[in-house]
A protein has these predicted regions:
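Histidine-centered acyl-transfer/condensation active-site motif
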Residues: 98
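An acidic/histidine-cluster motif and surrounding catalytic segment
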Residues: 1-94, 102-127
Length: 127
């Protein structure tokens, strides 16, 4: 069974591709097909409005397509704003968000259990 890790950057923001691949494999496994799209504010707002009925951009969205396939969308502009609120560097916060999205794809919802799982992976990757 072949799997894929597709990475599309539709912005000028720099992203840590290799770290994303390692994190994806640690959280979801090597057999999980993942597409990551780095998108601008208008595209993220459109996605958030369509799928969450929220008419504003957000920093990350994750969509499980099946048990072994999903998509993550990251908006670097919103991530940069949020990084300051969490007292993190931009690069660190992008990885923080990515772990968050991966854990959602694993099937977890916001709460104590999800936070515990995220913390374990953040520690593993120094995030």
């Amino acid at each position: 069974m072949s799997t894929s890790f597709d990475f599309f950057n539709d912005t000028k923001a720099k992203m840590p591709h290799l770290a994303f691949l390692r994190m994806k494999e640690a959280v979801l496994g090597k057999r999980y097909d993942l597409s990551v799209a780095i998108v601008g504010t208008s595209k993220m707002r459109e996605l958030n409005r369509r799928w969450r009925d929220k008419d504003k951009p957000t920093d990350i969205l994750s969509f499980p397509l099946s048990e072994t396939e999903g998509e993550i969308y990251i908006n670097p502009t919103e991530a940069k704003k949020e990084a300051k609120k969490f007292n993190r560097t931009y690069d660190n916060f992008i990885l923080f968000l990515f772990i968050h999205g991966l854990v959602h794809l694993k099937g977890y919802e916001h709460g104590v259990i999800m936070e515990s799982i995220e913390q374990r992976f953040r520690k593993k990757f120094g995030v």
